[in-house]
């Protein structure tokens, strides 16, 4: 018989080595404080300094994984935890690895008939054959260029002129071997949290700049968030169903946040999955959960209870 959660020793994995280390440290400290306030035996563990493979030997029973980006959100730490036999929060190995790859996630959604932006894929090796004219004829202008793998909107560029396309792709190639060139979606940006099997209310994101980049996500205070997002009940319901399908198709579990854009005609287009959403004071998941009655601490405990 497993020990009750309150008697278990919980490792809060935070920090790590990805480009999103700072965000993860902030999220991790918030989660740690919440768990301790709720009477849990929780300890901060930074994989940059501590060998995660030793956690079980050190008497830990369970992991709250709040690492962001590569190494923490891409299936590798999940695989390690499976190997040593420790239950952990969030998605498993396959869903974590898949959703870290924006291109393959979109291809899978598309195969299931779910709506995504039209895109072209460029790799480091195919870059020399890139023909901006052909791309623009297919996708129009402006365009969004982004690395397939890096999180937190690192390496993004909005391309307004055909002559700027190559340099934008070169910039994105600094962050990843594979780059997506996507049609520009001109409508609202929404994000939808999912907790277990419960789809929480959508949030509308209104950045003051051109789009929601790293600065707007984590630093700026002038990005506006609206929850409820202002959709009609009917549209919210449609969005809820779409997001739940998208979540199930890629095999998510525990909790995730799915980003959605509206195109020029007001149709929903799936953008990406965040399998370890931020849990800082700026973060969107707790904002949405609060509107249906979860305090930050209750939310953290619920995520822990969903761990497998």
UniProtKB/Swiss-Prot annotation:
ATP binds at residues 136-191. GO terms for molecular function: ATP binding; D-alanine-D-alanine ligase activity; metal ion binding. GO terms for biological process: cell wall organization; peptidoglycan biosynthetic process; regulation of cell shape. Its EC number is 6.3.2.4. Binds 2 magnesium or manganese ions per subunit. It is found in: Cytoplasm. Keywords: ATP-binding, Cell shape, Cell wall biogenesis/degradation, Cytoplasm, Ligase, Magnesium, Manganese, Metal-binding, Nucleotide-binding, Peptidoglycan synthesis. The keyword Cytoplasm applies. Residues 106-305 form the ATP-grasp domain. Pathway: Cell wall biogenesis; peptidoglycan biosynthesis. It comes from the Bacteria. Its cofactor is Mg(2+); Mn(2+). GO terms for cellular component: cytosol. It catalyses: 2 D-alanine + ATP = D-alanyl-D-alanine + ADP + phosphate + H(+). Belongs to the D-alanine--D-alanine ligase family. Cell wall formation. This is D-alanine--D-alanine ligase.
